[in-house]
């Protein structure tokens, strides 16, 4: 047994079916270990003879074998998992398509199961096929589509569109363009198209180019040069082995025979360095001149390449044909050594495929057995109970999501309405204040003209009723104020109407995912699950536009042939759920809604709201460069609500009619609010006037008290001995003058007799006042003087009008 391992001698293998090789080819066992032989006898390839018959013609096709080898190198397969890369650097191979586990036997089985109609999705590429599909043929086609298009959004139903687009742009494969469904083509033509797709990926896809540069050893096949007579070197033949089990391909390179009339040489000599492609020449007429001449070799290279043609001929297609070819060419030392190195590799590869197919067949048999077996009533009841629990859980989860969506939408609408109300309320007060100032100024001018004086006009001078706090100016502005009476949102009211039995206010406008359908209610009733929702949701959409108020509400349907809302931007009011034309919205509405955003200086546009376009809007649109974008998948639901943006991605929209209703609501409460404000202002004014009067009265009393104190302080002292004839009841006692400043002597009054206190200064003694000798005055003259003093005390003068006279003692 040979122990040499090369590119073809990978230490893995596959099983060999009984009768795959005749008795003359039993010599291969000498090159395989006994362990592998024992496992090959234990594991047999299922349907090996049937598959060999089906692919007999297809296996001789070079494109088919190339596709098999290419898929083995890019998917997780025997080649990528067991190939030893130590000699090329690294210890493992990272597959390009890690999510696909490829084997030739499994792939061919799935291909013919798809074509023979055993697959339930036969000829049905409209069914969405994902990476978890069981059919390997579908998964590989989907992966090729993603690699060709350069993104992962393509689907198998877009196969013809994307593939034909790339084939038309390629001159080498433009003849493969077809309008027939891919699965309806012949199996050989299908692999021709797949081969062309692989070639386009190799030329254009950068991801594959990087993978090829890092794993070049996978695409370097074992090859041996054949020593056949090539008639003077015009042909060169070689034999190389593909990763496919037992596939040997002969490569023949033909060259054009060099003749007298042919300008093509069998050898191509071109310089490697750029400096050898440039010639320097100097002009003898011009001194010190240098001219650079670049030699052109492109024509020679193109001619040489056109003189060479390469043909690929599949010599063996499976394990048995390879052993037969080996037995026939044992006389050739090169072929014998080449094949003997491949025998252990292919044997282990067949064992790998046999185990993989056996496990897959076992899983399929178990699945069919579980499906067809007779189940007990207890298990059936348990499954029904589990299904009921799952259905009930899904139902209540849907109700929770539905309720959460409604609450979230109502919250957004409530916030928007509150902001709009605040703006409308401020604008109403601004309009009212403007009219109030104008009316007040007008009345003031009229009063000036009537009175002919410059007396200012006071609001409080107008007569007002006690039960009505509004003044005449308020009443005049409320009745005929030009600015206040004009509507902020000028829009005509809608025509009240119904759409059959449906009221426009009863449309919930919920997305289809949150709508309750009759089928769901029937299914819940079958399982006996109680639900508070007894009626399905109405999924109709109502159209009524303020630009056409004469039209009654109508139902929007996808098949309605009308230009009223087809191919026109539509927007739905989030408050009344009526669909309207976007272009019919008053600019005042957009300006008002823009003022409620975080950046009021930015005016909202159509793309900021959930605007949709009904009907086919692709006729006037430019096509995208990406082929999968030219035919966008149609929306499953034709409801306008399902086409709009989610609530979190667009601004809340309130229509003109709803804002007009908000304005009317605010106008209804404006007069009561104004009365409250005026009553409060009147009360505040009365309080200010009362406080002012109290302050003035307090000040007057304080001044009166000060004058009384001053009057009492300047009254003369009365002594009983000096004025014996005066009444004691009207004369203050001497005790009242104990604290009087003795340095001050009031001036004598000619109208009354006042005592003058004299001072005598003695050294070392205190100053003691001495009463002078008062003249004798009659009782009749004293009484009028006392009455006059009492009258003066009863009518005190202003402090500024009183004159006090003090007589100071002379200074010695």
Swiss-Prot record:
Tagged with keyword Hydrolase: no
GO BP of this protein: chromatin remodeling; regulation of DNA-templated transcription; response to heat
Region (Disordered): 1-21, 614-646, 679-704, 762-812
Biased composition (Polar residues): 627-638
Biased composition, class Basic and acidic residues, residue ranges: 683-704
Keywords associated with the record: Coiled coil, Nucleus, Transcription, Transcription regulation
Recorded GO CC terms: Isw1 complex; Isw1b complex
Biased composition (Low complexity): 769-796
Domain of life: Eukaryota
Transmembrane segments: none
Sections of the chain in a coiled coil: 673-714
Protein localization: Nucleus
Function summary: Functions as a component of the ISW1B complex, which acts in remodeling the chromatin by catalyzing an ATP-dependent alteration in the structure of nucleosomal DNA. The ISW1B complex acts within coding regions to control the amount of RNA polymerase II released into productive elongation and to coordinate elongation with termination and pre-mRNA processing.
Subunit structure: Component of the ISW1B complex, which at least consists of ISW1, IOC2 and IOC4.
Note: Present with 7520 molecules/cell in log phase SD medium.
Protein name: ISWI one complex protein 2
Organism the protein comes from: Saccharomyces cerevisiae (strain ATCC 204508 / S288c) (Baker's yeast)
Gene that this sequence comes from: IOC2
């Amino acid at each position: 047994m040979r122990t040499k391992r090369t590119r073809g001698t990978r230490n893995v293998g596959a099983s060999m079916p009984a009768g795959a090789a005749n008795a003359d080819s039993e010599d291969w066992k000498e090159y395989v270990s006994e362990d592998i032989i024992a496992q090959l006898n234990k594991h047999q390839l299922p349907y090996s003879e049937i598959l060999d018959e089906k692919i007999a013609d297809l296996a001789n096709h070079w494109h088919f074998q190339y596709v098999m080898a290419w898929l083995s190198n890019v998917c997780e397969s025997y080649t990528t998992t067991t190939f030893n890369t130590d000699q090329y650097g690294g210890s493992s191979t990272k597959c390009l398509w890690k999510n696909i586990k490829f084997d030739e036997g499994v792939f061919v089985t799935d291909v013919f199961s798809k074509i023979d109609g055993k697959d339930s999705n036969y000829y049905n590429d409209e069914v969405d096929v994902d990476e978890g599909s069981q059919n390997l043929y579908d998964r590989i086609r989907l992966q090729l589509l993603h690699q060709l298009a350069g993104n992962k959004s393509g689907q198998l139903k877009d196969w013809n569109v994307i593939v034909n687009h790339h084939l038309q742009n390629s001159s080498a494969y433009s003849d493969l363009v077809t309008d027939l469904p891919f699965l309806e083509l012949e199996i050989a033509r299908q692999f021709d198209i797949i081969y062309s797709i692989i070639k386009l990926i190799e030329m254009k896809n950068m991801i594959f180019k990087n993978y090829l540069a890092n794993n070049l050893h996978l695409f370097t096949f074992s090859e041996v040069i054949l020593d056949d007579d090539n008639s003077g070197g015009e042909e060169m033949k070689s034999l190389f082995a593909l990763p496919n089990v037992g596939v040997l391909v002969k490569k023949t390179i033909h060259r054009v025979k060099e003749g007298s009339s042919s300008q093509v040489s069998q050898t191509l000599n071109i310089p490697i360095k750029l400096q050898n492609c440039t010639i320097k020449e100097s002009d003898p007429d011009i001194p010190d001149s240098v001219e650079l001449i670049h030699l052109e070799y492109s024509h020679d290279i193109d001619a040489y390449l056109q003189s060479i043609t390469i043909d690929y001929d599949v010599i063996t297609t499976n394990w048995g044909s390879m052993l037969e070819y080996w037995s026939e060419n044992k006389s050739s030392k090169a072929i014998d050594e080449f094949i003997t190195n491949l025998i252990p590799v292919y044997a282990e590869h067949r064992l790998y495929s046999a185990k993989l197919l056996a496990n897959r067949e076992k899983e399929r048999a178990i699945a069919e057995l579980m499906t067809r077996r007779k189940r007990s009533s207890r298990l059936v009841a348990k499954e029904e109970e589990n299904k009921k629990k799952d259905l009930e859980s899904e139902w209540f989860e849907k109700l929770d999501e539905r309720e959460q969506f409604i609450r979230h939408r109502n919250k957004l609408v409530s916030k928007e309405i509150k902001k709009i109300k605040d703006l409308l309320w401020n604008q109403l007060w601004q309009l009212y204040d403007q009219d109030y100032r104008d009316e007040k100024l007008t009345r003031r001018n009229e009063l000036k003209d009537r009175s002919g004086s410059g007396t200012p006009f006071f609001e409080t001078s107008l007569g007002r009723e006690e039960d009505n706090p509004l003044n005449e100016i308020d009443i005049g502005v409320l009745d005929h104020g030009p600015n206040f009476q004009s509507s902020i949102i000028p829009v005509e009211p809608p025509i009240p109407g119904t759409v059959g039995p449906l009221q426009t206010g009863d449309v919930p406008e919920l997305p289809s995912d949150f709508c309750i359908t009759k089928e769901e209610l029937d299914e819940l009733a079958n399982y006996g699950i109680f639900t508070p929702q007894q009626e399905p949701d109405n999924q109709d959409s109502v159209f009524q536009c303020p630009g056409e108020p004469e039209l009654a509400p109508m139902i929007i349907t996808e098949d309605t042939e009308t230009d009223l809302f087809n191919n026109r931007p539509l927007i739905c009011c989030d408050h009344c759920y009526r669909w309207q034309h976007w272009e019919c919205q008053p600019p005042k509405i957009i300006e008002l809604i823009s003022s409620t955003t975080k950046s009021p200086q930015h005016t909202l546009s159509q793309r900021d709201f959930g605007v949709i376009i009904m009907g086919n809007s692709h006729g006037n649109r430019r096509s995208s460069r990406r082929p999968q974008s030219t035919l966008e998948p149609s929306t499953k639901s034709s409801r306008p609500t399902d086409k709009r943006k989610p609530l979190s991605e667009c601004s809340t929209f309130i229509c003109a009619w709803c804002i007009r209703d908000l304005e009317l609501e605010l106008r209804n409460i404006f007069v009561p609010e104004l009365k409250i404000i005026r009553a409060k202002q009147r009360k505040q004014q009365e309080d200010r006037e009362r406080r002012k009067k109290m302050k003035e009265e307090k000040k007057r009393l304080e001044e009166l008290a000060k004058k009384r104190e001053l009057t009492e302080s300047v009254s003369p002292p009365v002594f009983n001995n000096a004025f014996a004839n005066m009444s004691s009841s009207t004369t203050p006692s001497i005790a009242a003058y104990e604290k009087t400043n003795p340095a001050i002597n009031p001036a004598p009054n000619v109208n009354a007799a006042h005592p003058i206190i004299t001072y005598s200064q003695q050294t070392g003694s205190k100053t003691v006042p001495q009463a002078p000798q008062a003249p004798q005055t009659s009782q009749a003259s004293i009484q009028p003087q006392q009455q006059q003093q009492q009258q003066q005390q009863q009518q005190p003068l202003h402090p500024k009008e009183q004159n006090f006279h003090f007589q100071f003692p002379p200074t010695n």
